[in-house]
Regions:
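C-terminal accessory regions
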Residues: 145-170
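Short helix-to-turn junction characteristic of helix-turn-helix DNA-binding domains
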Residues: 8, 59, 153, 200-204
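Accessory DNA-binding and partner-docking regions appended to nucleic-acid-acting proteins
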Residues: 141-143, 170-281
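Helicase motor core with emphasis on the C-terminal RecA-like subdomain
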Residues: 1-136, 141-144, 168-172, 178-179
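A general alpha-helix detector
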Residues: 81, 124-128, 145-149, 162, ...
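Flexible coil/turn residues that form the inter-helical turn or adjacent wing/linker of helix-turn-helix
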Residues: 12, 156, 205
Length: 281
């Protein structure tokens, strides 16, 4: 919420769309934004036809209004002065993301996009795919599409160039996205990867992100102590890096296919064959 409000405070008197994954998140964020002085509406499939029509009409006719919605909102919407699109969760694919951010800036003027996500979003998306009634091939393709989106999110390259490249469209750097304006510092992450992968391995590949990072950073968390993981050789070998650093680094290992999430084991982080190769190198 803090990141969203900070973003909106820099764009006072502008209209935009905020996409949420769940109906509850949609209503909760809408109420919060209104309490902070913003003019926000909510839209999702759980609302009545009259409620949805009223919200849509207000969004289309009023200025300086924010629509907080699930993906149920958007089809056929052509409001030219949408200045921003925020995703509060990871979209389902590059195609969905491209379509949704394309609703901003249709008047030809500059518009902004913001994508906020964490590992929990990836877990939810993977679980939605695995628990669907679709066939094996469809699930495989959906997971690959999600892989591409995760790679896009974690890429240090120009956002526009990477996004258009996915659709086989050649583009130069835009000199306008976060990676172009503030390029990330690239490092040789081999040793760091080995530390994280080794921690996943030594803890048995039974635990999620929080526990793995707690062990890596030498946390005295109750669960770490109860499991005896404070006595492992990897305990504390990554204490020189912050929690945020390791969360980001873990997402990158997932994006590059060196780690995977096992939903049969409640979202446990596990090492892939390519991850084992790095660990042994």
């Amino acid at each position: 919420k803090k990141n969203v409000v900070n973003f909106l405070n820099q764009r006072k008197n502008q209209s935009g769309i905020i996409y949420c994954l769940s109906r509850n998140d949609t209503d909760t964020l809408c109420d919060y934004l209104n309490s902070q002085g913003f003019n926000a509406l909510s839209y999702h499939a759980g609302k009545s036809a009259d409620e949805k029509l009223d919200a849509q009409n207000k969004f289309m006719t009023l200025q300086n209004v924010i629509m907080v919605a699930t993906i149920a909102f958007g089809m056929g919407i052509d409001k030219p002065d949408i200045r921003f699109v925020i995703h509060l969760n990871l979209p389902g694919s590059m195609e969905a993301y491209y379509q949704e951010i394309g609703r901003a800036g249709r008047d030809g003027k500059p518009a902004d996009t913001l994508l906020i996500y964490g590992l929990d979003d990836l877990v939810i998306r993977r679980k939605m795919i695995e628990e669907s009634d679709s066939n094996k091939d469809y699930k495989f393709n959906e997971n690959k599409r999600l892989d591409y989106l995760l790679s896009y999110c974690e890429s240090p390259e120009c956002r526009r160039k990477t996004l258009l490249g996915y659709f086989d469209d050649v583009s130069n750097n835009c000199n306008n996205c976060d990676n172009c304006l503030d390029p990330p510092n690239l490092i040789d992450g081999t040793v760091l990867a080995q530390k994280l992968l080794s921690t996943v391995f030594r803890t048995g590949q039974f635990f999620g992100q929080v526990h793995v990072i707690n062990v890596l950073r030498g946390s005295e968390d109750k669960k770490v102590l109860e499991k005896g993981h404070d006595r492992l050789s990897v305990y504390g070998i990554g204490k020189d890096k912050s929690i945020n650093f390791w969360q980001s680094f873990l997402r990158q290992l997932l994006a590059f296919g060196h780690l995977q999430i096992n939903f049969q084991k409640y979202g446990a982080i596990q090492i892939t064959e390519s991850g084992i190769t790095i660990l042994k190198s």
